[in-house]
Structures are given as structure tokens and as C-alpha cells.
Amino acid sequence: MSESQKKVIVGMSGGVDSSVSAYLLLQQGYKVEGLFMKNWEEDDGEEYCTAAADLADAQAVCDKLGIELHTVNFAAEYWDNVFELFLEEYKAGRTPNPDILCNKEIKFKAFLEFAAEDLGADYIATGHYVRRADVDGKSQLLRGLDGNKDQSYFLYTLSHEQIAQSLFPVGELEKPQVRKIAEELDLITAKKKDSTGICFIGERKFRDFLGRYLPAQPGKILTVDGEEIGTHQGLMYHTLGQRKGLGIGGTKEGSEDPWYVVDKDVENNILIVAQGHDHPRLMSVGLIAQQLHWVNREPLQGTLRCTVKTRYRQTDIPCTVTALDEDRIEVRFDEPVAAVTPGQSAVFYLGEVCLGGGIIEQRLPLQS
């Protein structure tokens, strides 16, 4: 079958990246249709407006490009497979990454299945800044060409089979080029700002949002020396390395340096803080990760020299990875790293290739 007969369903979010993705695929000769996913049942007016506006933008783009737009409601799947897990992690004092879960459970599972089974798609496409390469009959996940926008960190749970069914047209471009194409086509999304915030929950204030689902659990804020200097409303509102929102100033006789969260004592509901962003207590020499996903589906044997990111947009850290068993690895950094956060993902790279990753179960502190 030539590309001209192959059918691609593009996940249309109402943003510029998916809009341009649809256009590029049409240019490449595919039969293109769009799909707008509704993944959250709104419970307030503001959020409803955002979702409605995004759908209207997606529809306007599809009309302009002359393609059909389907809609689907994955709110139940999102609640069961993303949101409940997200809350569980927060309750346990960890800091999960919902975008990674959402890509795993919704965009490259529910959407992929729906597109193939209900819409007869050969491929799905998204506006992610990643690339794929096919080597020896297996698809690899590569970083996006635009280093500032590369989103491979969020897609490490994909298997080579899922990548083989996915196209990422804007991954070959830099963001300014994408905006330029949208402007030349006079697409309504050309100047729309990039969405931030939790995938599908949008820009609302995170603390207020979390407070609806998890009761406040006030506790003490202690310094690394054990001095009590304040109270927190719940460990879930704080992440390692955070300095905003602690509500504490300098101590009477101490320095005026800002305070940073350096640890959470989940058992005793205590938030531990120190002054200075590079306090030794905040540094880790490595980590243990679990719930591993390797893109090539082959568990790690022995050790591996590669680089790792412990959060999005971090500079790659050279490291040595050692398999502890089939589902746990130990990672040792060449140099200590600040704010390695349990619940977040550690994602591994060999050059341009994203190998996979896992959830940080614990950090290996420089000093405890």
C-alpha cells in the first residue's frame, strides 16, 4: 500500500503542534483525519471553556485543511488509569508525572486502539517533538530535533511496537519553523501559546485542584538540624528542591538565604528544609528505579554506560546502570545531582536514542 492510501489519525489537541502535524502528513500524501480526545469531565465553568475552546480550534483547523474531525471521550479511562494512580502517588508522598502516565494509558493505548479498531487507521500521529528510526526491524525513539522542545522524556514507556504505529511529523522541525508554517497557512492556532499544567487538567492552580481530592495533612517543617521552623499543609504540596510556597523566612540569628525542601519524612509527616539550593542533603549520588520500560522490550542484563535525565529538560547526566533484578535497577551518577525526586521518572539515553526508563523508587543520598 502506498503512503497515499495509508490512513493516519492525528490527535488534535487544538494546539499548534498537532495542527501542523496534520498539514505535514497531508503534504506527505497520507489520508488524514483528526481525533479530539476529551479526557476530563469538567466540574467548573473555567475548565469547560478551555476544553470547548480547544475543540473549536481543532475543528477550525480541520475545516481549513479539509479533513474530518472525530471526537471521543476517554474520561473514564483517564480517571481509572491515570488520575487515581496520580492521587495514590501523591498520598504516598511521592511526586508523579501525569503526562507520562497519560501518554502510556491514553494517547498510545486508548487512542491507538480506538484509531485502529474504530477508525481503521494504519497509523496514529501526535504533535510530540520526538523522532522515530527503524533499525533492524525495530522502531527506535529518538530525541526531537529541537533540543529545547524534545519530549522523548514523556514517551519512554512506549514499546517499539507502539512507535512503529506512530508518526511524529514535527519532531523533525524546530518550534519556530512549526509556528511559521501555521502562520503561512493562517491557522487559528498559529499564535496560541503552548499548554502547560497537568495534561488535560490544564492551567488551574495545582494546590487548589489537589485540595479537592486529598485532605490537607498539616505537619511540622524541620531544618536539617532538627529545629522546628514552621508547619506545612501536606507533604503532597511540596517537591524536592522547591523554594516557593514554604512560608518561612530567614531564622533570627541565621542567614537570609532562601529555604529549600531537601527531604520528606513520609512516616512522620515532616518536611525537611535547608538553606541554599546546593545543600549536600539535597544531593544524590544515584537512585533505585522500578516499573521499568525498555523501548526494545529487552530487560537490561548486567551494566550499561549511558546518560540519564531525572526530570524534564535537565541536562543529560552520565551514569552507570546496573540491573538488580528484572524490574529494578541501580543508577550511579558520575557527579552528584540535586533534587532527585521519588515518583518522578529516570529516562535513559545513548546519544540520540531514548532507551527507556523507570520510576524513581528511592534516591541514594550524598549524605543522610
From Swiss-Prot:
Annotated site residue numbers, Interaction with tRNA: H128, Q344
Enzyme class name: transferase
Subcellular location: Cytoplasm
Main location: cytoplasm
Region annotation (Interaction with target base in tRNA) ranges: 97-99
GO CC list: cytoplasm
Any one GO molecular-function label of the UniProt entry: ATP binding
Keyword terms of this UniProt record: ATP-binding, Cytoplasm, Disulfide bond, Nucleotide-binding, RNA-binding, Transferase, tRNA processing, tRNA-binding
Complex formation: Interacts with TusE.
Stated name of the protein: tRNA-specific 2-thiouridylase MnmA
Name of the encoding gene: mnmA
